[in-house]
Amino acid sequence: MKIRPVGITGLGMAVPERVLTNHDLERMVDTSDEWIRTRTGIRERRIAAPHEASSDYALRAAREAMAQAGVTPEQIDLIICATVTPDMPMPATAALVQAALGAHRAAAFDLSAACPGWIYGVVMAQQSIATGLYDCALVIGVELLSKMVNWQDRKTCVLFGDAAGAAVLQPVSEGRGILSSVLGAEGAGHCHLYTPAGGSRLPASPETVAQGLHYVHMNGPEVFKFAVRVMDEATVQVVEKAGLTVGDIDLLVPHQANVRIIDSAVKRLGLAPEKVVVNLDRYGNTSSASIPVALTEALTEGRVRDGDLVVCVSFGAGLVWGALALRWGR
């Protein structure tokens, strides 16, 4: 069986209109613009309207990616939606996107891998296309985390924002596309970043809501230590797996969670700052949407050129991580 090279042929993103600044948060919780900026690098984030859901933004990002790739809904035969904030527990948000797009030929499912979810979805889609099972996949990362954070908890509410990013994956020319990937997990650290209630362990009830157990709970210091370690380790692993070195990287697209984590990884890797995409100052941590949004903006700004080696790397709840090495182009 011939293994086909697979790459990204279209990108798209969608963010809410409402901007919530650090100064706005000063009026909501006991925090300050200076405290948030110096510890996270975040200045503002986007917040969805009360009536909006993840599928609304997933659909907008998907249509933009499809337009860039030049594909029709009838050509899409696989839709993967990476999210921890689905419209509802079931059915899959991907199925709602499939219906709204009119992509009636497409299989559709959701994937829950927190912040690296989009990378996990890209790897799943790549394998399916490489082996000939599918020809054209849509991989979406979407989160409306504003609906899952406790707006009275200053440790978490300042961190997150809402967004969606999407990519179309198709067969590409030899030597282009995804060269390698690395996925991993340290499940013993699951207790450091999680939402306690709302699942089968603690079904939603008046008691769980009263106790705030449906909100994101985070052990910040432990997550920080994990992130600093795996971000550069995964980057080195994925480029070496492709037979390359860190020095070959033209553009690094890291998960946009905390500028100190990014700076630490970049310093340890020895990369020049101009080779690193950072946009968390404007969007905050958008979880699975983080990397496709950053990659979309980098492409729009002309920072991604044909033949460039692009590396995407992320970490998140699980604790899990993932990285991709791509040779850009079709």
Swiss-Prot record:
Chain spans, region ACP-binding: 256-260
EC nos: 2.3.1.180
GO molecular function terms listed in the Swiss-Prot or TrEMBL record: 3-oxoacyl-[acyl-carrier-protein] synthase activity; beta-ketoacyl-acyl-carrier-protein synthase III activity
InterPro entries: ACP_syn_III_C, ACP_syn_III_N, FabH, Thiolase-like
A GO CC term assigned to this protein in UniProt: cytoplasm
S-S pairs: none
Pathway recorded for this protein: Lipid metabolism; fatty acid biosynthesis
Pfam name, any one: ACP_syn_III
The organism's place on the tree of life at top rank: Bacteria
Active site residues of this protein: 115, 255, 285
Keyword line: Acyltransferase, Cytoplasm, Fatty acid biosynthesis, Fatty acid metabolism, Lipid biosynthesis, Lipid metabolism, Multifunctional enzyme, Transferase
HAMAP family reported in the protein's UniProt record: FabH
Function: Catalyzes the condensation reaction of fatty acid synthesis by the addition to an acyl acceptor of two carbons from malonyl-ACP. Catalyzes the first condensation reaction which initiates fatty acid synthesis and may therefore play a role in governing the total rate of fatty acid production. Possesses both acetoacetyl-ACP synthase and acetyl transacylase activities. Its substrate specificity determines the biosynthesis of branched-chain and/or straight-chain of fatty acids.
Subunit composition and interactions: Homodimer.
Record text about domains: The last Arg residue of the ACP-binding site is essential for the weak association between ACP/AcpP and FabH.
Entry similarity comment: Belongs to the thiolase-like superfamily. FabH family.
Protein name: Beta-ketoacyl-[acyl-carrier-protein] synthase III
Organism: Symbiobacterium thermophilum (strain DSM 24528 / JCM 14929 / IAM 14863 / T)
Gene: fabH
